[in-house]
Amino acid sequence: MDPAASSCMRSLQPPAPVWGCLRNPHSEGNGASGLPHYPPTPFSFHQKPDFLATATAAYPDFSASCLAATPHSLPQEEHIFTEQHPAFPQSPNWHFPVSDARRRPNSGPAGGSKEMGTSSLGLVDTTGGPGDDYGVLGSTANETEKKSSRRRKESSDNQENRGKPEGSSKARKERTAFTKEQLRELEAEFAHHNYLTRLRRYEIAVNLDLSERQVKVWFQNRRMKWKRVKGGQPISPNGQDPEDGDSTASPSSE
């Protein structure tokens, strides 16, 4: 603060000519009321610098002491306060409006920053929230589950397809479809001879339009059935099938 201004604030009763310079010359007629009169001019500490420049240009002879106010020009509450505390310096109420004026423009950016912060938070929340992340994770989990289920189904189908041809091929190899005529001729030959020579097996295969292997397999199965039913013993003394000697030329069925 300027030393001249501080000296003016400390002097509670400045001389009358100093205060008269700030009073309006038209206020003499209204002095009978006894009430303190404020100058009509908008001269105060809260005006802009351009107004202060015009005021100093209009009153070039004023000193810094003219800017101080007497207790008579203060409001009633402040006048009472000065009477109760004559030696106490002036309260800093003069500077409150200035500080308020300084705080108001500063509060704008702070409020703006808060609003911007909230708006930015809102933008962040709107652009990407935890719900979207969870939704994306859930969709990926569902896709992985679907893929795993498809792979399992494909593997099971492949295993089934692999098992079917093997079973069917075994069934085809084990069973041979014979006609009634073929079965009749084979049964008649088995009634006369339980074992066939290689030459006789060849003749039967040619007559019945079969292969030697098919004829051999049929006679082997028929002998096994006859043994289970009759409980007969093998005819050959060595207990070996006579056809086994000729089986070297033809592949065995088992």
Curated annotation (Swiss-Prot):
Molecular function in Gene Ontology: chromatin binding; DNA-binding transcription activator activity, RNA polymerase II-specific; DNA-binding transcription factor activity; DNA-binding transcription factor activity, RNA polymerase II-specific; HMG box domain binding; RNA polymerase II cis-regulatory region sequence-specific DNA binding; sequence-specific DNA binding; sequence-specific double-stranded DNA binding
CDD domains the UniProt entry points to: homeodomain (cd00086)
Biased composition (Basic and acidic residues): 154-178
A GO-annotated cellular component: chromatin
Region of interest (Disordered), residue spans: 86-178, 227-254
Signal sequence segment: none
Protein's cellular compartments: Nucleus; Cytoplasm
Keyword Cytoplasm (UniProt): yes
Superkingdom in the source lineage: Eukaryota
SMART domains tied to this protein: HOX
Gene3D superfamilies: Homeodomain-like
Ranges of the DNA-binding region feature: 171-230
Entry coiled-coil feature ranges: none
Keywords: Activator, Cytoplasm, Developmental protein, DNA-binding, Homeobox, Nucleus, Repressor, Transcription, Transcription regulation
Function of the protein: Mesodermal transcription factor that plays a key role in somitogenesis and is specifically required for sclerotome development. Required for maintenance of the sclerotome polarity and formation of the cranio-cervical joints. Binds specifically to the promoter of target genes and regulates their expression. Activates expression of NKX3-2 in the sclerotome. Activates expression of CDKN1A and CDKN2A in endothelial cells, acting as a regulator of vascular cell proliferation. While it activates CDKN1A in a DNA-dependent manner, it activates CDKN2A in a DNA-independent manner.
Disease annotated for this entry: Klippel-Feil syndrome 2, autosomal recessive: A skeletal disorder characterized by congenital fusion of cervical vertebrae. It is due to a failure in the normal segmentation of vertebrae during the early weeks of fetal development. The clinical triad consists of short neck, low posterior hairline, and limited neck movement.
PANTHER family found in the cross-reference section: HOMEOBOX PROTEIN MOX, HOMEOBOX PROTEIN MOX-1
Descriptive protein name: Homeobox protein MOX-1
Source organism per UniProt: Homo sapiens (Human)
